[in-house]
Design a protein with these regions (language model features):
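Conserved P-loop
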Residues: 1-81, 120-131, 141-144, 160, ...
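Anion (oxyanion) recognition and catalysis
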Residues: 34, 106-107
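Short acidic/histidine-rich motifs immediately flanking catalytic phosphotransfer sites
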Residues: 81-85, 91
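Structural recognition of the conserved hydrophobic beta-strand(s) that form the central parallel beta-sheet
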Residues: 87, 111-118
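Conserved ATPase-coupling elements of RecA-like P-loop NTPase cores
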Residues: 90-105, 121-126
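Short basic (Lys/Arg) and small-residue
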Residues: 136
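A charged, well-structured terminal subsegment
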Residues: 143-163
Length: 201
């Protein structure tokens, strides 16, 4: 988003299912800000160590150095207030405290760019993204490709594991599915069983 100028802060939200390019889009915007010689700071939650401990990493392996925080509140304690652009990846691991932090940063004149899942593995709104969508100035909704039928996918399908709301995983535990192919929760039929059944059918 390039229409806001001057010392006015704002919030941009990039949301969608896993494998839809959210982190990739976040990195792209942050790199553009760096090219524009803006002071940029990047944060990610400590729980997200799937690909790197101290980098934002997209599923396509784009990388950017980031600070690691245990909570959203830690961002305000660690940020250099001279920064002009603040990026936050994996917002769902930050908790609802991120809403107040993002508001405070934007109110202080910063461009805040946040990426995260908008729905959980049950297909329900996944905090804090819904509230950030209501408060933000710019929203980008990304779609993935359904691995079953090839249609646009808006859901993150959990394939195995527990019923806990937050379970960190990648392609070994999740896949993108469209509205028709999505099964809230953990599906009874595994992907291997699905492929076998398709071949036999």
């Amino acid at each position: 988003m390039d229409i806001i100028t001057g010392n006015v802060g704002w919030i941009e939200v990039i949301c969608g299912p896993m494998f839809s390019g959210k982190s990739e889009e976040l990195i792209r915007r942050l790199r553009r800000a760096m090219i524009a010689r803006k002071r940029v700071e990047v944060f990610k939650p400590v729980i997200d160590n799937r690909y790197s401990n101290d980098e934002i990493v997209s599923h396509g392996d784009l990388r950017m150095k980031s600070q690691v925080v245990a909570s959203a509140e830690e961002i305000t304690a660690r940020i250099d207030w001279r920064s002009e652009v603040v990026g936050v990846d994996e917002a769902n691991f930050m908790g609802e405290g991120l809403v107040e932090v993002a508001q405070r940063l934007a109110d202080s004149g910063k461009q805040v760019i946040i990426s995260g899942l908008d729905t959980d593995y049950m297909g329900r709104p996944f905090a804090p993204i819904p509230e950030l969508l209501a408060l933000g100035e710019a929203i980008t909704k990304t779609l993935a490709i359904c691995v079953r039928c090839g249609n646009p996918a808006k859901h993150t399908q959990r394939l195995r594991g527990s019923d806990d709301l937050i379970v960190v995983g990648a392609a070994d535990m999740y896949e993108a599915r469209c509205r028709r192919c999505f099964e809230p929760g953990i599906p009874k039929q595994t992907e291997l069983e699905f492929v076998k059944a398709k071949r036999q059918g």
